[in-house]
């Protein structure tokens, strides 16, 4: 248990710290692709996927990590990811975004997090299990994309590296706007940890490294997998309700670490403060959290479990879920932000 606590908690703490300090929000990034025609954060996300993919595929090849591929429902990945994409716009953050913003003191994120956790728990082990199984048993295929295509996985990795490099290099060649900033208040390590603003591409690199480290770190406890948020969140609420210590796996300490890491980063940068949402935000956060929990359960993952971890191993589920999640974000963004301005 000590290995589980330290391994999961430390990876989560570092992850949460990075997310808070770099303001790495996939909900905002996917929304900006549509509304602002700004793909910067999406390209940073591709960097994270690519970095993780290079490392984890070699770990699998060396036998350090076991076979991560499982069967999944294509219907669940499509319907669930679309619903999840809508939910994260309503909630104001994806799974990790909700966890790290809760650590900053946003009470709206606490509301979204509660309903996300409880609805996911209900889908996985509660009264909504029949609803979960309703879709999970349809259109089931294996997760191994390279195997389905009949090609070595290294071909897919080379393609990913080329595509990511192309977009990143093209973006870096564009003239950068000079943004006015205040003179630094701190010096040394404190400045770099709690004050300096980092480019989103650097954030993507760091997140990719953390995602890579998560694989062998969780393997130490017998768990085959990388970063994942939904199932651990469901297990945490189940433990709180039932007291069943079997629910306390590596992932539970990962998500708790994300919360603590974000809190420490927010306190150190003086960005932590309790913020009370209005009734409209509470309503959206509630509905968004429910959509997130149900959607991620159907899809078998969230923007991290599917969008980052599964895509890195060239999981069919991951590469179906990611674009469908983005489509869900765009749909909700149109309804909530674009359409009212047209009227």
Show the residue positions of the predicted features:
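Membrane-interfacial helix-loop segments of redox and metal-homeostasis proteins
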Residues: 1-343
């Amino acid at each position: 248990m000590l290995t589980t606590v330290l391994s999961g908690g430390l990876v989560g703490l570092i992850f949460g710290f990075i997310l808070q300090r770099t303001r790495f929000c996939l909900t905002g990034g996917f929304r900006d692709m549509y509304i602002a025609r700004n793909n910067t954060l999406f390209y940073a996300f591709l960097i994270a996927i690519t970095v993780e993919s290079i490392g984890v595929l070699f770990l699998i090849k060396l036998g350090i990590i076991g076979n991560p591929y499982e069967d999944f429902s294509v219907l669940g990945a499509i319907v669930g990811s679309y619903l999840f994409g809508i939910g994260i716009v309503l909630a104001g953050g994806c799974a990790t975004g909700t966890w790290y913003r809760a650590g900053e003191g946003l009470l709206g994120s606490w509301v979204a997090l509660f309903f996300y956790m409880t609805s996911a728990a209900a889908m996985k082990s509660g009264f909504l299990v029949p609803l979960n199984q309703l879709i999970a048993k349809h259109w089931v295929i294996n997760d191994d994309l390279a195997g389905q295509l009949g090609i070595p996985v290294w071909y897919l990795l080379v393609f990913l590296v080329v595509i990511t490099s192309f977009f990143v290099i093209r973006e870096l060649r564009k003239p950068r706007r000079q943004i006015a900033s205040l003179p630094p208040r701190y010096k040394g390590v404190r400045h770099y940890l709690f004050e300096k603003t980092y480019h989103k591409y650097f954030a993507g690199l760091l997140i990719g490294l953390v995602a890579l480290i998560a694989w062998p770190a969780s393997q130490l406890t017998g768990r085959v997998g990388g970063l994942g948020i939904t199932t651990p969140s469901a297990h945490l609420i189940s433990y709180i309700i039932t007291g069943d210590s079997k629910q306390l796996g590596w992932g539970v300490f990962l998500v708790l670490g994300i919360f603590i890491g974000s809190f420490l980063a927010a306190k150190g940068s003086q960005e932590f403060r309790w913020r009370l949402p209005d009734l409209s935000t509470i309503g959206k956060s509630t509905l968004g959290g429910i959509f997130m929990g149900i959607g991620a359960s159907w899809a078998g993952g969230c923007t991290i479990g599917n969008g980052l971890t599964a895509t890195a191993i060239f999981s069919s589920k991951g590469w179906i879920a990611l674009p469908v999640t983005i489509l869900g974000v765009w749909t909700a963004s149109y309804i909530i932000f674009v359409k009212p301005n047209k009227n």
